């Protein structure tokens, strides 16, 4: 498990199975397309601490190019519902992830707009929303 401490004091634990998925989609070749999906996890009760336990991977419905990824909503909600039920309501949608074709990825303006949208429409039940760029 990877433990990350963010500058605002938030702690994020990423399970090894999720790290393996992220690594498998890194854009190492010039022809590799961006990939992404949703983040599923839970908040440690009464703490600014999150555990990232599952992610979706690209589907045939997603739009992938070398420099962009647009996730389809078709498969996301059923996956969220399944994880919520399996966890007795503790795990839910925590945010989004995708790759960038650069060694040190930084959020684009599109990425920042996506996070603002998720926060404003309250897509996530948690106080914080995560964006992981691989």
What residue ranges belong to the model's regions?
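Conserved beta-strand-loop surface patch within small alpha/beta domains used
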Residues: 1-93, 102-134
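Histidine-centered divalent metal-coordination motifs
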Residues: 98-100
